[in-house]
């Protein structure tokens, strides 16, 4: 009988289903708390490190912003690039 129940799947108790649903709701609410996620400062630091390999920039010249609108999230990254020496002399 256990093999048959394995194939057909066991029906979960209503308590375990309710617990799973509450965990999903809590995780969703926790992820929406605050204006900016925890990873934004680290993302900004990593962007500075990568871009600094190729171009000399000031860490303050990179701005990372997350905007939420209903179900849409927009990650905006603004990087102020220094003028090249040829452009600066013109």
From Swiss-Prot:
Signal peptide: none annotated. Keywords: Cell cycle, Cell division. Transmembrane segments: none annotated. The keyword Repressor does not apply. It holds the Pfam family MinE. The keyword Cell cycle applies. GO terms for biological process: cell division; regulation of division septum assembly. Belongs to the MinE family. Prevents the cell division inhibition by proteins MinC and MinD at internal division sites while permitting inhibition at polar sites. This ensures cell division at the proper site by restricting the formation of a division septum at the midpoint of the long axis of the cell. This is Cell division topological specificity factor. It comes from Bordetella avium (strain 197N).
């Amino acid at each position: 009988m256990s093999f048959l129940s394995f194939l057909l799947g066991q029906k979960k108790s209503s308590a375990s289903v309710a617990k799973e649903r509450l965990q999903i709701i809590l995780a969703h609410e926790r992820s929406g708390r605050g204006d900016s996620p925890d990873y934004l400062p680290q993302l900004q630091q990593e962007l500075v490190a990568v871009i600094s390999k190729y171009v000399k920039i000031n860490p303050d010249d990179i701005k990372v912003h997350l905007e939420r609108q209903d179900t849409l999230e927009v990650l905006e990254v603004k990087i102020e690039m220094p003028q090249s020496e040829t452009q600066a002399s013109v």
